[in-house]
Amino acid sequence: MIIEEALRSGKRVALPRVRGKRRMEFCFIKSPADLKPGFMGIKEPGPWCPKAPAPFKESLVLMPGIAFDRNGTRAGYGGGYYDTYLEGHAECIKAALAYSVQIAPEIPAAPADIKVDMIVTEKELIICSQDFREIR
């Protein structure tokens, strides 16, 4: 639904495609028809979809996770794909969509873990990064 609305409103949409162990790239899609089953059966852009450039300051990256804390630390799915991809591109906007039950008091973090700047739940917007405090 988010993807379809973004495409309908004229946004450029890039989605991840797994390229090997702990490696992924983002590729532009023009419609949901550009998606095919990929790694672990998750839909990803087909091989015909052009590769997107590295994220920049105005890029919004929606990061998945099992649980999050209010400092932006997330428990992912164990592959480190997003942490590896975003290494060196921390200036982009990193957000997560979650249910309020996914917000934990504290999530243990490793030095290589990339934090999210904000979390949107069905109940609130949690601003985790000092750079976005004025949004509240």
Task: Pin down the residues of each PLM region.
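Short, basic, glycine/proline-bearing loop/turn elements
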Residues: 35-37, 67-71
